[in-house]
Regions:
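Bacterial N-terminal signal peptides that target proteins for export
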Residues: 1-9
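Extracytoplasmic entry segments of secretory-pathway proteins
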Residues: 9, 22-24
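C-terminal motif of bacterial Sec signal peptides marking the signal peptidase cleavage site
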Residues: 16-19
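GH16 jelly-roll
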Residues: 24-277
Length: 277
């Protein structure tokens, strides 16, 4: 998610000390067939109602705009904003007063509980569509403190509610980032993104990042032979983030339609694969 996330590491709230790696994931029960050369290393099928699994997820917390002038306050372990019900993770942005702001939402992270170098990250999700909504599936470097954009960012899926049915994929690095208007990005049409579930995925190797919807690749970013770390910082661990922002520099370009709230971002599963040695 395109943002200056200098506060993200200090805002992370770790709610459990048990590592997700203590519970090896089981084989997928639905969705796309995993690549034959990959093995499943991390997953959440959201099959237990309640707050999200604290062995897999933590939260970024706060309401300082997150570098994008966003309007929401991100809460932690609050079921109104993040819960598992009916086999789905629900991230819900709501209009309500909270810590001096008018909206609440949640931003879930796997940092310290799921950090990977290379692999395939796959999320099956249904998006909100109200004007002012800004859901995202993305990764950030797992260093502490975070150095953005030096540590890299992979945007697997972003959708802004005023541009219904269009999803975006991007990468951000020191050389290529939205602050300098040099980011590498692409967009594709998913007309029923808010009416049905789709598989948003990125395949990340030592030389290429390729992002797809339902198996159709629409964005690639290749390592430059002489680019150095400024162009390719993606040889170090990254972690996953799922969130719904309200408004902001991009999501709020055409305002926020309060009549369309709450915004609900539904996630059927998250799966991470890595190549079999």
């Amino acid at each position: 998610m395109t943002s200056l996330l200098l506060h993200a590491a200090s805002a992370a709230l770790l709610l459990a000390a048990v590592s997700c790696h203590d519970n090896p994931p089981t084989a997928p029960s639905s969705g796309q067939t995993p690549p034959a050369t990959y093995r499943l290393v991390w997953s959440d099928d959201f099959d237990r109602d309640g707050v999200p699994d604290a062995t897999r997820w933590s939260y970024d917390v706060g309401g300082h705009g997150w570098g994008n002038n966003e309007l929401q306050f991100y809460t932690a372990a609050r079921r109104e904003n993040a819960r598992v019900e009916g086999g789905h993770l629900v991230i819900e942005a709501r209009r309500e007063p909270w810590e001096g702001l008018s909206y609440t939402s949640a931003r879930l992270i796997t940092k310290g509980k799921g950090d990977w170098t290379y692999g395939r990250i796959e999320v099956r999700a249904q998006l909100p569509a109200g004007r002012g909504s800004w859901p995202a599936i993305w990764t950030l470097g797992s260093t502490t403190p975070l150095r953005w954009p030096d540590d890299g960012e992979i945007d697997i899926m972003e959708h802004v509610g005023f541009d219904h049915g269009v999803v975006h994929a991007s990468v951000h690095t020191r050389r290529y980032n939205h602050v300098d208007a040099t980011q590498r990005t692409a967009r594709t049409s998913v007309p029923d993104a808010a009416a049905g579930f789709h598989v948003y995925a990125t395949e990340w190797t030592a030389d290429r990042i390729a992002t797809s919807v339902d198996g159709r690749v629409y964005f690639t970013f290749d390592r430059e032979p002489q680019g150095g770390r400024a162009a390719w910082p993606f040889d170090a661990p990254q972690h996953l983030l799922l969130n719904v922002a309200v408004g902001g520099d991009w999501g709020g370009q055409q305002g926020v339609d309060d009549a369309t709230l709450p915004y609900r971002f539904l996630v059927d599963y998250v799966r991470v694969y890595q190549r079999t040695p």
